[in-house]
Amino acid sequence: MSIQVHDTLTAQKRELVPLEPGKLRLYVCGPTVYDYSHLGHARCYVVWDVVVRHLRARGLEVRFVRNFTDVDDKIIQRANERGEDPIALASRFADAFHEDMDALGNLRPDVEPRVSGHIPEIVALIARLVERGFAYAPGNGDVYYAVRKFPEYGRLSKRNLDDLIAGARVEPGEAKRDPLDFALWKAAKPGEPAWDSPWGKGRPGWHIECSAMTQKHLGAPIDLHAGGKDLVFPHHTNEIAQSVAATSDGLHAEDFARYWMHNGFVQIDDEKMSKSLGNFFTIRDVLARFDGEALRFFLLGTHYRRDFNFSDQVLAEAERRLSALYETVEKAERLGAGVEPGAEPAFVERARAALDDDFNTPQVLGIVAEAFTEANALADRKGKKSPEEKARLAAFARGARAVGAVLGILGRPPAQALSAIRDRAAARRGIDGSEVERLIAERAAARAAKDFARSDAIRDGLLARGVVLMDGPQGTTWKVE
């Protein structure tokens, strides 16, 4: 087994070799919790959830840490607007974030540190940087990192200091020695949360927070650091500078994290998602209209490094495809019940290999689609199934569930999943499910009375509204086209 990942630091695909055999330490930058999470968060955290699932399925003991930033300028601004305590506001939105992640089927990290609970570690790390000459306190209560002291600054983002200096500036009130320098500690201001430090009361800057929490919960160096590609600069670039300067004499980026991975942006109908364009969607906006697993399935259809394009139409198509997968699993499990499954189907190992190759989820979904087509053909073949055919269907169902477990899909009983997906689709079309059930009962009575004209009229009337009836051994079910 060889797992290949695209490493942002080297801009190459590399074999993922943990520092300690059999164990992997992963840090993913979590959300700044000042509002409900948006589609960009959904895309990001589904990606890293699949990474964790696959690494564990491949036998690695993964320690997964993802933080909450609950001390930040945006949180303070939002809290002041609402007259709310900043930490309380952040806690409320952190709870909402958990609800959204649960709806998407994401596993919880092993550790979820919060900035507000790590102030002593942050202060100690800043003091270490001052002691080693990489940071300075100008005397106004702030502390800054001296960017030019770190020789590999910009290596991750492929930017040199000459390029950066053109866009750098000193804000009014800042006491930077160099426009490139960034804040590690900010002096207290009225109405803001503040903590004691050797430089006076204040609060941490954004970048130092993740460095401190990574070191506290994973040590240094770690194996893998991940997040959205918008974090490459300045956040991850600054994390490297801080963490390496505090812990290593070699001053190489690898002394903090051996591998860096980043996921692409979310676009809405081929435009960048933004509030100013009026195309900004929270996860809750989407989950009010679509099933959470359908959204997850949709997100997996684009390779994690590529930008992801969202549209209702394509999500609805993904929802239809997911329903078809569940229908096939239902048939395979029903027809293969009571027999010993046959050998593991070849598609399972092909799916593993695709995930080993930089977590190629679109390729996995293509492999799964081929396998499901074959299973459908076998399940729908007329006549009684032989013991061998039943064993093949049972093996397919077990393999489908195994691949689904790594992707975080196909984990529900088919009837439950199909009903949930159908009900969301019906609601979007203005279809009343209780009315459909009433008409199904009326149609059953008409058929029992041999009133086939009435039976056909009900079926055709529902079909005209996008409702397809399916008659089976257990009765009539329905779905929305």
Swiss-Prot record:
GO molecular function: ATP binding; cysteine-tRNA ligase activity; zinc ion binding
Subunit structure of this chain's protein: Monomer.
Binding residues for Zn(2+): C29, C210, H235, E239
Organism of this sequence: Anaeromyxobacter dehalogenans (strain 2CP-C)
Details of cofactor binding: Binds 1 zinc ion per subunit.
Cofactor needs: Zn(2+)
Any matching Pfam family: CysS_C
Biological process according to GO: cysteinyl-tRNA aminoacylation
Location(s), subcellular: Cytoplasm
GO CC term (a single one): cytosol
Database matches in InterPro entries: Cys-tRNA-ligase, Cys-tRNA-synt_Ia_DALR, Cys-tRNA/MSH_ligase, CysS_C, Rossmann-like_a/b/a_fold, tRNA-synt_1_cat_dom, tRNAsynth_Ia_anticodon-bd
Binding positions for ATP per the UniProt entry: K275
SMART domains attached to this UniProt entry: DALR_2
EC code(s) of this entry: 6.1.1.16
Motif 'HIGH' region in this chain: 31-41
Keywords for this protein: Aminoacyl-tRNA synthetase, ATP-binding, Cytoplasm, Ligase, Metal-binding, Nucleotide-binding, Protein biosynthesis, Zinc
First-level EC class: ligase
Main location: cytoplasm
Catalyzed reaction equations: tRNA(Cys) + L-cysteine + ATP = L-cysteinyl-tRNA(Cys) + AMP + diphosphate
Family: Belongs to the class-I aminoacyl-tRNA synthetase family.
Protein name: Cysteine--tRNA ligase
Motif 'KMSKS' region mapped to chain: 272-276
